[in-house]
Curated annotation (Swiss-Prot):
The gene is LB1. This is Leghemoglobin 1. It comes from Medicago truncatula (Barrel medic). GO terms for molecular function: heme binding; metal ion binding; oxygen binding; oxygen carrier activity. Leghemoglobin that reversibly binds oxygen O(2) through a pentacoordinated heme iron. In root nodules, facilitates the diffusion of oxygen to the bacteroids while preventing the bacterial nitrogenase from being inactivated by buffering dioxygen, nitric oxide and carbon monoxide, and promoting the formation of reactive oxygen species (ROS, e.g. H(2)O(2)). This role is essential for symbiotic nitrogen fixation (SNF). InterPro entries: Globin, Globin-like_sf, Globin/Proto, Leghaemoglobin-like, Leghaemoglobin_Fe_BS.
């Protein structure tokens, strides 16, 4: 069974909610560092800070991550697969030392953030839609990593 119109709509609506509050980006990175403190050095905008400090770069990167997952949902619905819009993503992830467990941490942080953002609109169906879209994006990035 492919990615459904309803799943795409669920991802789109919660993506819009995510973008409305800059604090959601801070929450996302706070969850990542709670799960994997050593990952701090992988993000240029966190390396030299105490904790997670809000910044334009942090906002931009979080929006890029969530936006790419949202784009994956759109692609899954349209074509059944995900093609990376940025061919350098594989190389960047290799350069930063990203390995499989990091994808799991980011996925958990993404799902927790979406749950928080969605409030009473959260459901297992919503979580599954984000999970499927993230997994497809992660697979495309891993493929680009070789």
């Amino acid at each position: 069974m492919g990615f459904t119109e309803k799943q795409e709509a669920l991802v789109n609506s919660s993506w819009e909610l995510f973008k409305q509050n800059p604090g959601n980006s801070v929450l996302f990175y706070t969850i990542i560092l709670e799960k994997a403190p050593a990952a701090k050095g992988m993000f240029s905008f966190l390396k030299d800070t105490a904790g997670v400090q809000d910044s334009p770069k942090l906002q931009s990167h979080a929006e890029k991550v969530f936006g790419m997952v949202r784009d994956s949902a759109v692609q899954l619905r349209a074509t059944g697969g995900v093609v990376l819009g940025d061919a350098t993503l594989g190389a960047i992830h290799i350069q930063k030392g990203v390995v499989d467990p990091h994808f799991v941490v980011v996925k958990e942080a993404l799902l927790k953030t979406i749950k928080e953002v969605s409030g009473d609109k959260w459901s297992e169906e919503l979580s599954t839609a984000w999970e499927v879209a993230y997994d497809a994006l992660a697979a495309a990035i891993k493929k680009a990593m070789g």
